[in-house]
Amino acid sequence: MMVQPDPSHDEAALRRTADLYAIGADRRDKALWRAVLDDDCVIEGPGFTCSGLEENLGSIDLLGQMFRATAHRVSGQIAETAGESAQGETFGTAEHLLRDRDEVLAWSLRYRDRWRLRDGRWRFTHREIVIDWEETRPAKPGE
């Protein structure tokens, strides 16, 4: 009897990459990003493209320079696997507490994602950020 792979394991692992990416961005934790980004990962969004692991890790420093805090939330994901690759979309929001005033820049966004299974772990090879809408609103930062 041949045992069929359980796709729910891949789905959970792919979702975990998105969750760890979001947590890594908010905590400015490069180790979390290193765990979920492949060496040749490309992340692109409005007005920027980062290529390779080191350049992407450097963008965490830029987040810290641009914003006092961020809150990335993953609300859903659709993905399909094909052997050792996968593609899909990850949906969520990203809130950015501006550095120069008490306002939040909020995005409703999607990532068009591609992954590779390497050494038993799914890692992003490409993330394209698509902003569906954005808003700026007042914020009252915590103490």
Question: What does each of the following model-derived ranges do?
Answer:
Residues 72-74, 106-111:
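Short, surface-exposed coil-to-beta transition loops
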Residues 94-98, 117:
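Beta-strand elements of well-folded, non-transmembrane domains
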Residues 87, 108-138:
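Short beta-strand edge/turn micro-motifs at domain boundaries
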Residues 97-102, 134-141:
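A short, polar/proline- and glycine-enriched secondary-structure boundary/capping micro-motif
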Residues 63, 71, 97, 127-134:
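Extended, non-catalytic scaffold segments that flank or surround catalytic motifs
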Residues 1-27, 31-35, 39:
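Short, low-complexity N-terminal intrinsically disordered segments enriched in polar/charged residues
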Residues 30-94:
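A solvent-exposed, acidic/Ser-Thr-rich amphipathic alpha-helical stretch
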